[in-house]
Curated annotation (Swiss-Prot):
One of its GO terms (cellular component) is plasma membrane. Disulfide bonds join 48-259, 161-210. This is Ecto-ADP-ribosyltransferase 4. Residues 1-23 form the signal peptide. It is found in: Membrane; Cell membrane. It comes from the Eukaryota. Residues 287-300 are cytoplasmic. The keyword Aminoacyl-tRNA synthetase does not apply. The chain crosses the membrane at residues 270-286. The gene is Art4. Glycans are attached at residues 110, 157, 201, 253. Residues 70-255 form the TR mART core domain. A lipid is attached at residue 264 (GPI-anchor amidated alanine). Belongs to the Arg-specific ADP-ribosyltransferase family.
């Protein structure tokens, strides 16, 4: 996970840096600036959840994404079986698809990395989103899952914020105290500071998030998933021999997009017959675990 440069290119820079920097390298940390990530795909789907689910099903978006990403079907199969083995009661309105979306994101590095890159560079405009953003299904269900988990937690515990930690190795962040930033991606952050420690130089974020949701019931780790649209104020920044320490405090939210898939389809999509286009959706609602396992593997 990483922050973005203007234009959404920081993800690629960081990936190249990690791939090209050997373990134990003494090279100077990569220095990057942060901003509000204006080009990141940040849809909150406010007021259109039911319509989004209908469009995703009718448009066979899951199948389209499976066809685009060669590892995708196997990642979802594995995540589905993982969820079946640990399935717990879900909050109101949350479905097994929401749960498996969290599992596939938190457990599969290829999925989370490619989603981050797509959010940065494949949705800079409505037209680009429509043609080039091939994570419409996953993006919606991750966003919706965070919102539903927060709603459930708020109902039980009132307004809920989390103090979490996220570390980035060999990266020096240029962020001024008092400035407002956002990550522009789904960021997994740990509730345990010790889990973020790595060898070498590291930028450690201490994040006070009020829009993130605890996903430890799904990922089996004490972590919180922060949505791409949450804003943060840089409260403090200090240096140490092991790297920078940056404290962030939630400062609301900001989105450029809302219900973008529906807007795109209202312009060019012909009405489709009501069918369950996503075979994955069929399998996850089967109550029998053994039957679900047989049916999950069959379509792929």
């Amino acid at each position: 996970m990483a922050l973005w440069l203007p234009g959404g290119q920081l993800t690629l820079l960081l990936l190249l840096w990690v791939q090209q920097t050997p373990a134990g390298s003494t090279e100077a940390p990569l220095k990057v600036d942060v901003d509000l990530t204006p080009d990141s795909f940040d849809d909150q789907y406010q007021g259109c959840s039911e319509q989004m689910v209908e469009e995703l099903n009718q448009g066979d978006y899951f199948i389209k994404e499976v066809d685009t990403h060669k590892y995708y079907s196997r990642a979802w199969q594995k995540a589905h079986l993982t969820w079946l083995n640990q399935a717990k009661a879900l909050p109101e309105s949350m479905t097994p698809v929401h749960a498996v979306a969290i599992v596939v994101f938190t457990l599969n590095l290829n999925v989370s990395s490619d989603l981050a890159k797509a959010m940065a560079r494949a949705a800079g405009s409505p037209g680009q989103y429509s043609q080039s953003f091939h994570f419409k299904y996953l993006h919606y269900y991750l966003t919706s899952a965070i919102q539903l988990l927060r709603k459930d937690s708020s109902t039980k515990n009132g307004s809920l914020c989390y103090k979490v930690y996220h570390g980035m190795k060999d990266v020096s962040i240029g962020a001024n105290v008092g400035s407002t930033i956002r990550f522009g991606q789904f960021l997994s952050a740990s509730l345990l500071k010790e889990e973020t420690r790595v060898s070498g130089n590291q930028t450690l974020f201490t994040i006070f998030t009020c829009l993130g949701a605890s996903v430890q019931d799904f990922s089996l780790r004490k972590e919180v998933l922060i949505p791409p649209y949450e804003l943060f104020e840089v409260v403090s920044k200090s240096g140490s021999p092991k790297g920078d320490l940056i404290n962030l405090r939630s400062a609301g939210n900001m989105s450029t997009y809302n219900c973008q898939l529906l807007k795109a389809c209202s312009k060019k999509c012909a009405p489709a017959p009501v069918v369950i286009g996503c075979l994955f959706l069929v399998t996850v609602v089967i109550s029998s675990k053994s039957r679900a396992q047989r049916n999950l593997l069959a379509p792929f």
